[in-house]
Amino acid sequence: MPINIPKDLPAKEILEQENIFVMDEERAYSQDIRPLNIIILNLMPEKEKAETQLLRLLGNSPLQVNVTFLRPATHEPKTTSKHHLEQFYTIFPHIRHRKFDGMIITGAPVEQMPFEEVNYWGELTEIMEWTKTNVTSTLHICWGAQAGLYYHYGIPKYPLPEKCFGVFNHTVEVKNVKLLRGFDDVFRMPHSRHTDVKREDIEKVPDLTILSMSDKAGVCLVASNDGRRIFLTGHPEYDATTLKEEYERDLAKGLPIHIPESYFPNDDPSQPPLNTWRSHANLLFVNWLNYYVYQETPYEWE
């Protein structure tokens, strides 16, 4: 089934070229199907890239999905045009009365700041509190996961001695959990972050279960016992070239950065990187949409 997106969204052409089934709202409204309503709080600086990456994964589900893009009203991004934001995004006061079947809170390049110093932290906490009553299941990604663990459970983040940067092996810690249904015992996922959460802090919280770990990247996937809050410290949505672009960006800025681990063939940045995480990324999103959103959400919200 398709993903429903605004008619002129730039991601539409890219997704169609990749044979991802998309349709605009006009065609979707003509189908007598109850679609899932997913809201994406996009905190990434390059919003159009993040849109395409997330829509690509949502579009591989057999379910019909309506997507709403949300941005903080208290933050003015520097790398996305005002026209794009006005055309395709809404702000929290305009949707706080609505119910959504699922929500995605993306990462953001603010992880080295204390949470309370992020200029939209107050608004973000208001949104995360709202999800308790208005969203069936929320998927938090990278810094979004750290922010959610801190807000909901008081779990802090810790600075790393060097950036966790590369594509790492992960193991399934809990068998027969629906979110990881169909996963291999070992799977790969990109990470790109300067901070971490600790296993021992999470294990102190009875409502949380660690579903996946990495020897090198640490905690990867955490879920609340009711499945309403999912925390993912990696970036399964990343394109094959995203880490390459981040590496070249940091080199150009003169920042201390090492070659992304287990990413370039033979650790040679002149070689094109291979996407070795795509199948599990798609499976993760399909499982979340099916078992944690579609199977749990009411047909009609009260």
Curated annotation (Swiss-Prot):
Positions marked as site (Important for substrate specificity): S192
Cited Pfam families: HTS
Binding, substrate: K163, S192, R249
UniProt pathway: Amino-acid biosynthesis; L-methionine biosynthesis via de novo pathway; O-acetyl-L-homoserine from L-homoserine: step 1/1
Active-site feature positions: C142 (acyl-thioester intermediate), H235 (proton acceptor), E237
Predominant localisation class: cytoplasm
Described function: Transfers an acetyl group from acetyl-CoA to L-homoserine, forming acetyl-L-homoserine.
Similarity remark: Belongs to the MetA family.
NCBIfam families per record: metA
Protein name: Homoserine O-acetyltransferase
Species, as recorded: Geobacillus kaustophilus (strain HTA426)
UniProt gene name: metAA
